Amino acid sequence: MRVAKEDVEIKLQLPGVVMRQHKNFGDVGGYGRISGEYFTLAAGVDTTPLFQGLEGNLCQCPHWGYVLSGRITTTDAGGLKESVSTNDLFYWPPGHNVHVDDDAEIVMFSPQHEHTEVIDHMIEKTR
C-alpha cells in the first residue's frame, strides 16, 4: 500500500503546524516486538537472489515505512508491482521482493523476530 503525503488527511492545521493522519495502516497483532530500521539503498539493488530459499522466495515479513528519498518498486507473489518514492508512506505485506529504482533512503518498522530471520538469511546468502 502506497500513500502519498498529499493523500493523508489533514487533521489539524495551525500557523507552523500541519498534522496528518492515515488510519488503518496495517495490523501488527500477534507479531510481538517491532524494530525500527534505516536503510540506505543504491539504485539497481534487487532482493530476488537474496530471498531465494525463503518461503515462496519472497520476504514474508510485513513492513511499514517512509521514503526519505528515492524510488523503490516491490513485486508480490502474483506479480503485482507497486512503486513508492520520496515522501510516501508505505505498507509492504508479507510476500514481496524489492527493486531499488533510484538511490533511496527509507525508515521502516518491522516485526523484530520475523525480519531478523530474513536479514540473517540475506547475510548467509552473501557469504
Question: Which ranges hold each PLM region?
Answer:
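A short, N-terminal "cap"/entry segment at the start of jelly-roll beta-barrel domains
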Residues: 1-48, 55, 127
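Well-ordered beta-strand positions
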Residues: 65-66, 91, 99
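ATP/adenylate-binding site constellation spanning eukaryotic-like Ser/Thr protein kinases
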Residues: 69, 95, 103
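Short histidine-centered beta-strand/loop micro-motifs
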Residues: 48-58, 76, 82
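Conserved hydrophobic/aromatic beta-strand scaffold that supports enzyme active sites
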Residues: 19, 36-38, 64, 81, ...
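Short acidic-glycine-tyrosine-enriched beta hairpin
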Residues: 76-96
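Short, conserved beta-strand element in jelly-roll/cupin
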Residues: 56-74
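Double-stranded beta-helix
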Residues: 3, 99-127
